[in-house]
């Protein structure tokens, strides 16, 4: 326990907040180049082949990023925009690729939550035809 004099002289050390996405270095997004595009299996109770990409960011750091949505057009040397945000059942994946930006195309035939997947607004006629399908 410090004395009052010690506190006056030195003060208390602030606890630094640890970043959840350190590779972005405080930026909201970073551009990167896909080094490798592959799949990965999730943690214990879940089972799937989640699509991931190893991305070399513009600051030289290499990260593993998740490719959200159904289907993608990414391959090696694709330029992508990466944002923070982990995937709970994939250990070590702390970043996501933004769909609909740079080389990552938006998700096809996406009707709901379109903004999250870079999907354009469907034509009025196309939406009416798809409404009956369930």
Swiss-Prot record:
Residue stretches of biased makeup (Low complexity): 124-134
GO cellular component, one term: small ribosomal subunit
Entry-linked Gene3D superfamilies: Nucleic acid-binding proteins
A Pfam family recorded for this sequence: Ribosom_S12_S23
Molecular function terms from GO: rRNA binding; structural constituent of ribosome; tRNA binding
Keyword line: Methylation, Ribonucleoprotein, Ribosomal protein, RNA-binding, rRNA-binding, tRNA-binding
Basic residues bias (residue ranges): 112-123
Keyword Phosphoprotein carried by entry: no
Residues found modified as 3-methylthioaspartic acid: 89
Name of this chain's protein: Small ribosomal subunit protein uS12
Organism, scientific name: Fervidobacterium nodosum (strain ATCC 35602 / DSM 5306 / Rt17-B1)
Lineage: Bacteria, Thermotogati, Thermotogota, Thermotogae, Thermotogales
Gene, per the UniProt record: rpsL
